[in-house]
Amino acid sequence: MKNIIFLIVFLMSGMCYGQKDFIWEKIDSVPKSKSQIYSDTKLFIAEEWKSAQSVIQNDDKDAGIVLIKGASTQNIFFQLNDHIYSFYYTISFYMKENKYRILINNVYCYSGRCGNYEWPKMDCSDSYPGFKNAGMNENRYFTLMNNLKNELQAIFNSYIKFISSPISPSKDW
């Protein structure tokens, strides 16, 4: 009897987990030293975010890791109001000699507001969680998720382009 109950609970727990995290990852080689990749990564962060020091959570040059915690605000207009959803995400930059890795993950909604009212915090997923969990219909949900994914994809692509560009010319200007 215990085994049957355990099996039922085990199977149900897998079905109850609804959030499927958005993940972007790339590992590639570039003709740059670890130090140059690190410097270029810090420069990219400074150019991409308004306050680079406030988003950097971990910065270890020796280990070749820079970890940032970013935020994104997505607006969608429906029911005659502007609904504002705020999301957090983590970007990890790893670097070695002639090699880098970028990883974007831990994307989640931490706030949903419409005026003074709090809306449900929705899962970030490629599948519609239902009206009760999303607080909006399927079409609006996918519009919001696509806008969020496009923003994160743009950051991902910008970094790859930035880090792959050749080493800047001489500093004698």
Language model regions located:
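Bacterial Sec-dependent N-terminal signal peptides
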Residues: 1-22
